[in-house]
């Protein structure tokens, strides 16, 4: 996308990043249409699209094309199911505004360590557990998982 924007002499600003994000994610909702729609897949889509989810869904709906009218109708029906699931999961989990309850600063303070890859790995485990629905999106559950993960990595609180 940046190369195209440069060729067209368009600004490489937030609008370019917005277009890039939509292009990167535009096949995700369509993939959900053909598979069983899980809460986890919807949470991840909501998390990655963030506030641009509505625009992404409009783009994806416009992208449903085929010469076979029956196929188009079936895809549109399945797409409507995905949209319902998005609303349901968003209402239940508030994923669009997701913020990991565990911060790198907290991990460094508790375990008296300097910035390193372990911090990112712990945060990633917590984030994935929340997005997969394994733990609720709250501080206590995230903190417990952080401690468990840190212990497995050999970190001890001082």
Named regions from a protein language model:
Residues 1-74:
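Divalent metal-dependent catalytic cores for phosphoryl transfer on phosphate-bearing substrates
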Residues 3-4, 66-158:
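Charged substrate- and nucleic-acid-binding regions of tRNA-handling and nucleotidyl-transfer enzymes
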